[in-house]
Amino acid sequence: MKILVLNSGSSSIKFKFFDNKVVKASGLVEKIGEQNSKVILKNVLNNESFERELMINNHEEGLSIVNELFKESGILADLNALDGCGHRIVHGGRNLSEHCLVDDYVLKEIDRVSIFAPLHNPAHLAGIKTMIKAAPSVANVAIFDTAFHRTMPDFAYMYALPYDFYDKHNIRRYGFHGTSHAFVSSRAASLLEKDKSELNVISAHLGNGASVCAIEKGKSVDTSMGFTPLEGLVMGTRCGDLDPAILPFISHLKGLTIEEIDTLMNKKSGVYGICGYNDFRDIEREIEQGNDKARLALDMFCYRLVKYIGSYFAVLPKTDAIIFTGGIGENDSLVRQKVCERLAHLGIELDFELNKQRISGERMINHANSKVKVLVIPTDEELEIARITEELISN
């Protein structure tokens, strides 16, 4: 099957093209709405690139140029030749709890729950509508970051607020990074030679946004992100868990509006708020140069991560493995070491030499005697989206 995967942002479109589950092309439309917009399509098989630089006013114009580059490259005759298009959608809300084929109801519901993800869902919706217009005969599939967490029990996803806030306004914990957690847990089952239905793992997706997921018998039973991706771990620029009473206090102290506080928590906090850096390579370089705030930021990040992983040991009946994924999880040996050392009493023995090896790909980095395996698994959300898209279209 020929499947296109789209991740539409407010001013960009990232895409990958799969032919029979093999990546044939990837690319990006960037700076939509600006004078110096750019479209890049790369033939993954021979590394040949095709580019356009011109003013792109909207997503529709951007996708039209992507179509031109597909034709020029010879990779795809036309977008209408696709069997399906999978769209990454951050938030499905309460009603769209599973991945699904797009119809009028789905479009309206994605729009309705945009209030939960105002930075993401409107752009995703624009991407879907653009694709429908460009290739009316192609099936579109909505893949929700929240869907993997639909199996959380009510006592895990409810907030201890008056019940009406859930019943009437759908305020609950939804969780995110679901496509990534689903992909790496599936790969872990293969690596550990276990059936997914018997797999108990803790998945840590660590990037600029970060979350942990407790997976019991292959299903999500708890996760660190909540109603929004702000809850949970200390992140690149997000504060994570916070005493809610701090918000009105800050508002009175600094005279900030709700919108300004939201920006403060999402874009000016996390490790960046502590030390001025959100790239962990910069943070670790600063630590080597004696920057105490950088040391504090790293310690806070790792400590919160340890607390969440430790709590999920208590949630799961047993734990087969911890999975590290995402840019930091896959590449930062110091973070993995600091976390695993603090969890040693739970049966985790890291092999320090394996951990330090700078190699890509899936690998096991625990000592042979470790009761709990430690896995590094590069995530591939686009491949997972393509797989689900193909599955739903076939059925």
UniProtKB/Swiss-Prot annotation:
Substrate binds at residue 88. GO terms for molecular function: acetate kinase activity; ATP binding; magnesium ion binding. Keywords: ATP-binding, Cytoplasm, Kinase, Magnesium, Metal-binding, Nucleotide-binding, Transferase. Its EC number is 2.7.2.1. Homodimer. NCBIfam families: ackA. This is Acetate kinase. It comes from Campylobacter jejuni subsp. jejuni serotype O:6 (strain 81116 / NCTC 11828).
